[in-house]
Swiss-Prot record:
This protein is one of the two subunits of integration host factor, a specific DNA-binding protein that functions in genetic recombination as well as in transcriptional and translational control. Pfam families: Bac_DNA_binding. InterPro entries: Hist_DNA-bd, Histone-like_DNA-bd_CS, IHF-like_DNA-bd_dom_sf, IHF_alpha. The keyword Transport does not apply. This is Integration host factor subunit alpha. SUPFAM superfamilies: IHF-like DNA-binding proteins. The keyword DNA-binding applies. Coiled coil: none annotated. The lineage of its organism: Bacteria, Pseudomonadati, Pseudomonadota, Gammaproteobacteria, Oceanospirillales. GO terms for cellular component: cytosol. One of its GO terms (biological process) is DNA recombination.
Length: 100
């Protein structure tokens, strides 16, 4: 089985909720757009029962060019982090090893 895509999510909304395909696709896009806008505005996203998306600042640190071995600085940047919620962790652990 491959990765779950936005198209797969829209198809599921179409099948399970009876939305038409255009509405289902728009709903999925709007969901992710809301998450993007919140993070762009430095607002954490907390999805109860699923997990939290937060922003974290990473400071500059030394790095190395793997081809030449030359030391180069890795610039400071802001990154998105995801922390799974307890319910998600429990569901994943319950199914660990039962599917391949």
């Amino acid at each position: 089985m491959g990765a779950l895509t936005k198209a797969d999510m829209a198809e599921r909304l179409f099948e399970e909720l009876g939305l038409n395909k255009r509405e289902a696709k728009e709903m999925v896009e709007m969901f992710f757009e809301e998450i993007r806008h919140s993070l762009e505005d430095n607002i954490p996203v907390k999805l109860s029962g699923f997990g939290n998306f937060d922003l974290r600042d990473k400071s500059e640190r030394p790095g190395r060019n793997p081809k030449t071995g030359e030391e180069i600085p890795i610039t400071a940047r802001r990154v998105v982090t995801f922390r799974p919620g307890q319910k998600l962790k429990q569901r994943v652990e319950a199914y660990a090893g039962t599917k391949s």
